[in-house]
Structure formats: C-alpha cells, structure tokens
Amino acid sequence: MPKMIFRNHEVKNLDQFLLLDLSRSFGVEPQIEEVQSEPVCPVPDMREVQEEVELFRKSWEEEQVQLRARAEREAQDLKERVEEEITAYREQCTQEADRILAQAKEQSELQISEAQQQAERMIAEAETSRQKICDHSKAEGIRLGKEEGFRAGQEEVRYLTERLHKMIEEVMGRRQGILRETERQIVDLVLLMTRKVVKVISENQRAVISANVVHALRKVRTRGAVTLRVNLADVELVTQHKQEFIAAVERVDDLTVVEDTSVGRGGCVVETDFGEIDARVASQLHELEQRVLEVAPIVVSSMSASKGS
C-alpha cells in the first residue's frame, strides 16, 4: 500500500507546478467514425504451401534439364559446323599448297634441265677443243718430232681434262644451289599462303573463335572458374555464347571474358589457377611454321641423294 501521510521533513516545497490530467473530460466529445472491417484472407495451410513449393521446384528442375539439353544440342551443332568449315578450309589450303608445290617443282625441273643442257654443251665444246688440239699436236709432233709432239699433246690433254673437271664441278654446284633455292622458295610460298589464309579465316569466320575457345577449354584439367582473354572484336560474340561454351566442356564452372590486345582475332588465352593455355592463332601458326621448317632440310637432302644416285 503506498504511503499517504508524510512528515514535515519528508516534504520539500518546489517553485514548479506539475499539472495532472483529469480523469474525465468535460468538453464535447468527438464522434468516433465507425470503420467497417475488411475481410481477412485466410492463412494458407502449411501442407498446401509445401505442395506448391514442391511443384515449383519440380518445374524449375525440368526447365533446367531442358535448357541444359538445348545448350548441349546447340553446342554439338556448333561444333559440327565448325569442324565442317575447318575441314573445308583445310582441303582448300591443301589444294592451293599442292598447286604451288607443283608449279615450283616444274620451275625447278626446268632450271635443272637448262643447267644440264648447258653443261652438256660445255662438255661437248671442251671435247671438240680437246680433239682439235690433239689433232693439231699430233700434226705438230709429226713435223717437230714424235716425242716432242707427244709430250705437248699430253700437256694439252691434261690441261683440258682439269678444266673439264672444274667445269663439271661448277655445274654440279650450281645444280645443288638451284635445288636449295627452289626448296626455300617453296617453303616461303607455303608459309606466306598459310599466313594469308589463316588471317582471312580468323577475321571473317565467326566459327574460328568458337572452335578455338571450345578446344582450349577442353584442355582445362581441374574444375573451377577460368578467365578467357580474347581480342576486342571477339568479346561480344564470346560473351553471348558463354553459357554454351560452359555446357560444351566438363570442368568449367564459371567463365569470365576479358579483352586482351595481345591476342589476335580468332584466338584466345585461357587462364586457370595452375597456369594458362595459349590458343592464339599466331601461336598455332608459329608451331606450324616450325614443323614445316623442320621437314624442309630433310626434303632437300633426300632430293640431293636421289639425284646423285
């Protein structure tokens, strides 16, 4: 029960006043507007919510399966189109290379034939000169004496023989030089044609960048996210088909496409946590050139050996 009676020393007078609200108002009370209650929607049953969630989940999973199947079909179609185009261009390049090689071989055979004809003419002229000198020496020997004429004839014959051998060596050396020069020209023509064809294909065929990206991503050995560096002109195309590239390979969970000015059109560089995979067109072309240059000396040697035998 609260204390109701206080002593004098328990009370302290204050200058401030505290006004207390009346428990009852003596003014005109405002009219309270009656508000009509709105119907409350019934709370759904938890089982119905779970069933709806389960139906949504199944629908979402079916949609994901359909999207994945469609992406795999599109990736397979893209791969087949790329392989067909690459095969067609490879056949075209092979035919062009065969044509150039045939022309170069025909020119080299013509030069070799001319050199052989010139050597035969020189040998015939030398033989004619030798015979004339022998006849002259013989006649001179008869006039001056058999022994002196025979010695003079031997000297002339030895001189002509040495000269003839030198001429033959010069002709053979020229023939080998023609073979080496022709082989070098053939290799240069093939490499030049390859560079031009690859440059045109890389800049004008959108399927080249797609094929290079899929080929490079399939070399990734560990699962995770990777970064793909491409040329500025290929960024938009690669970004549009990013999900198709991910669906076409197994170990790539996420793909980030960035611009790199050091990467030529049609090529790419894949960066992973364990290193990078270089699929630039220039790198592939350089590897092809090295292989051609490694084979070229063998071709020259085999041609020289066959001609010598």
Swiss-Prot record:
Needed for flagellar regrowth and assembly. The keyword Nucleotidyltransferase does not apply. It comes from the Bacteria. GO terms for cellular component: cytosol. GO terms for biological process: bacterial-type flagellum organization; protein transport. It comes from Treponema pallidum (strain Nichols). Pfam families: FliH. Belongs to the FliH family. Keywords: Bacterial flagellum biogenesis, Bacterial flagellum protein export, Cytoplasm, Protein transport, Transport. It is found in: Cytoplasm. This is Flagellar assembly protein FliH.
